[in-house]
């Protein structure tokens, strides 16, 4: 069976070689006589899997030694709720920059336990641009400044790290982590749900400067305490072992492919192919985002009417191009071009777009 090109925004496409390896090792792993999903998370065998995943992730992202790496169950929304509990004192403010749907989600999750202030909000302009950092209204004693590095629904991406002075910068990198080189030392904390660039759904990564873990935060159960998770190597409770294992395979695959420098090159090439098809269509396809902040990972676009949108989704699926329907919040079409999407997938989509316009334009 030939695999289609899967443009899903998440859970997203995984490298076929990773899927094949996971399939081969599902029933019996590494000569232990049992599946990886059956062995204890505290066994020497799984501890080696976990240690290798962290070592490879540190190598892939050039994570400094003064940053802890946590592997946590669940997704980014859970992390958003836990950030103020861990890093904001009772009554302290935290600043949020809203550049799309997920920025709104982040502040909503935090608002129950912190004075969540909007430092900048791009909604009035339809989330088509990112307000310059110099225009943000930051609280001088804020616990942190939170941004969403890439908005998967609206297709807006920070192309540079904003300067927030001495305040810790926290960022949701769920959809763009490992897509290009990143100077992690400019952030206090970054986090990412795995299901876009790092692996399967159900596990997330938190990369946090160790001195921030010393903050008292707010009263919380130990299971919600990131310092406790760091002290126990992310095994305070039973972790999602299968997800952690596949994440490790995916990170190793990225290293073998050439690392973040190589994926930056591929991702730029893929994005150029799809944006080229949009911009060269004479208005048949429309992307509303300001070019300077267009996402490389998630490209939303619109056809002249909703009937053509539906026909595009139907015909593209028949052509082996899956999950191109836009998010219900905005409609239209959306192509997600994460690391595991090969350049051939973007080429196939661009060719289909040209053919579709020739037949229906």
From Swiss-Prot:
Annotated localization: Cytoplasm
Q: Which HAMAP family match?
A: SerC_aminotrans_5
Q: What is its EC number?
A: 2.6.1.52
Record flagged with keyword Magnesium: no
Q: How is the cofactor bound?
A: Binds 1 pyridoxal phosphate per subunit.
- Could you tell me what this protein is called? Phosphoserine aminotransferase
> What is the originating organism of this protein?
Xanthomonas euvesicatoria pv. vesicatoria (strain 85-10)
Q: Pathway, per Swiss-Prot/TrEMBL?
A: Amino-acid biosynthesis; L-serine biosynthesis; L-serine from 3-phospho-D-glycerate: step 2/3; Cofactor biosynthesis; pyridoxine 5'-phosphate biosynthesis; pyridoxine 5'-phosphate from D-erythrose 4-phosphate: step 3/5
Where primarily located?
cytoplasm
Q: Which InterPro entries match?
A: Aminotrans_V_dom, Aminotrans_V_PyrdxlP_BS, Pser_aminoTfrase, PyrdxlP-dep_Trfase, PyrdxlP-dep_Trfase_major, PyrdxlP-dep_Trfase_small
Q: Which domain of life is it from?
A: Bacteria
Point out residues bearing the modification N6-(pyridoxal phosphate)lysine: 196
Question: Record's family?
Answer: Belongs to the class-V pyridoxal-phosphate-dependent aminotransferase family. SerC subfamily.
Pfam families, per the entry:
Aminotran_5 (PF00266)
GO BP annotations, alphabetical order: L-serine biosynthetic process; pyridoxine biosynthetic process
The keyword Ligase is annotated on this UniProt entry: no
Q: Which cofactor does it need?
A: pyridoxal 5'-phosphate
Alphabetized, the UniProt keywords read: Amino-acid biosynthesis, Aminotransferase, Cytoplasm, Pyridoxal phosphate, Pyridoxine biosynthesis, Serine biosynthesis, Transferase
Subunit structure of this chain's protein: Homodimer.
Ligand binding (L-glutamate): 42
């Amino acid at each position: 069976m030939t695999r289609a090109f899967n443009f899903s925004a998440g859970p997203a496409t995984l490298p076929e070689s990773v899927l094949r390896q996971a399939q081969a090792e599902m029933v019996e792993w590494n000569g232990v006589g049992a599946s990886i999903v059956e062995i204890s998370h505290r066994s020497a065998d799984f501890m080696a899997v976990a240690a290798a995943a962290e070592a490879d992730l540190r190598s892939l992202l050039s994570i400094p030694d003064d940053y802890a790496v946590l592997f946590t169950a669940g997704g980014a929304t859970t992390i958003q709720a836990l950030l103020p509990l861990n890093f904001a004192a009772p009554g302290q403010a935290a600043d949020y920059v809203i550049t799309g749907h997920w920025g709104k989600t982040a502040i909503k999750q935090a608002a129950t336990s912190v004075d969540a202030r909007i430092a900048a909000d791009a909604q009035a302009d339809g989330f088509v641009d990112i307000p310059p950092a110099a225009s943000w209204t930051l609280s001088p004693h804020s616990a942190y400044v939170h941004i969403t590095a890439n908005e998967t629904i609206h297709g807006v991406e920070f192309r540079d790290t904003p300067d927030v002075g001495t305040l810790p910068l926290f960022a949701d990198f769920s959809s763009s982590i490992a897509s290009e080189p990143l100077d992690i030392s400019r952030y206090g904390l970054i986090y990412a749900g795995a299901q876009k660039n790092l692996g399967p759904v159900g596990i997330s990564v938190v990369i946090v400067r160790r001195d921030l873990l010393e903050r008292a935060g707010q009263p919380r159960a130990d299971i919600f305490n990131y310092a406790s998770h760091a002290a126990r190597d992310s095994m305070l409770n039973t972790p999602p072992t299968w997800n952690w294992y596949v994440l490790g395979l995916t990170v190793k695959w990225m290293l073998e492919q050439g690392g973040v420098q190589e994926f930056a090159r591929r991702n730029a090439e893929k994005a150029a192919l799809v944006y080229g098809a949009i911009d060269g269509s004479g208005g048949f396809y429309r992307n509303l985002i300001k070019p300077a902040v267009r996402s490389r990972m998630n490209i939303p676009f619109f056809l002249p009417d909703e009937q053509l949108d539906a026909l595009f989704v139907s015909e593209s699926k028949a052509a082996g191009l899956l999950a191109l329907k836009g998010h219900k919040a905005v409609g239209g079409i959306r192509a997600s071009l994460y690391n595991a999407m090969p350049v051939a997938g973007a080429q196939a989509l661009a060719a289909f777009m040209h053919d579709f316009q020739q037949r229906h334009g």
